[in-house]
Regions:
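C-terminal catalytic "cap/lid" subdomain
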Residues: 1-236
Length: 236
């Protein structure tokens, strides 16, 4: 089957790496997720990955800590996750290169668009850590930013649900799943796709978002080939 997308930016939440508990690294889960990424990579698609940090730290739950400091700790958590994902992919025989938005040359080179594109053109998966490098911005926004910067065809948001619903499907059995959505409806109805900053950036740059379930990591390869997976959000 032909590829629907030639270059994707994949967002993986930190909690996903933690397995059922959502904390730390769950080795079987990490194996499965990276195995799914490998299958997509073998199809010939160029891949960039942004990883969240919620399996180690959530700035919004940091109590009385000053928000800027809490977010900096969260950025460091995403770097740890980027290194772990990169290492697992390398173990599976997939070449990678890690880039950080925070200057830490002993760990990984700083992100530049030129270097990220060079890595992907060389067949490597570019793994981005450190969020945007600034407080008050989510890793969803970091994913949207990197996707726009590297001219990705689509942003993949791999989650714990199989798409976007009109209300929480875990709480409401009658929740309706959308196959497609416009950014206008997402923003007007405040649907739980991502924060408004990220959604607006994608809308303004005509970057579609595909939201799908990571419980089956093969969904990544299916989505790359254009199979009916998850919910597609686009600028209608």
């Amino acid at each position: 089957m032909a590829l629907k997308y030639k270059r994707i930016l994949l967002k993986i939440s930190g909690e996903a790496l933690g397995g059922e508990k959502g904390m730390g690294f769950d080795e079987p889960t990490l194996d499965a997720i990276c195995g799914g990424v490998k299958k997509a990579h073998e199809l010939g698609v160029q891949i960039g990955i942004v990883v969240g940090g919620g399996n180690f730290w959530r700035g919004r739950s940091s109590g009385k800590m000053e928000r800027t400091l809490a977010d900096k700790i969260g950025m460091l958590a995403t770097v740890m996750n980027a290194l772990a994902v990169s290492d697992k992919l390398e173990q599976l025989g997939v070449p990678t290169e890690v880039f950080t938005s925070i200057t830490m040359p002993q760990v990984a080179p700083a992100f530049t668009r030129k270097d990220a594109l060079r890595a992907m053109d060389e067949g490597k998966i570019a793994v981005f850590g450190g969020g945007t490098g600034n407080p008050f911005f989510s890793t969803d926004t970091a994913t949207a930013l990197r996707a726009v910067e590297v001219s990705a065809d689509v942003m993949f948001k791999a989650t714990m649900v199989d798409g976007v619903y009109d209300k929480d499907p875990h709480k409401y059995p009658d929740a309706k799943k959308y196959d497609t959505l416009t950014f206008t409806k997402v923003l007007e109805d405040q649907l739980a796709v991502m924060d408004g900053t990220a959604a607006t950036m994608c809308r303004d740059n005509k970057l579609p978002i595909l939201v799908f379930d990571l419980a089956d990591p093969d969904n990544i390869a299916r989505a790359v080939q254009g199979e009916n997976v998850g919910t597609l959000v686009y600028e209608g």
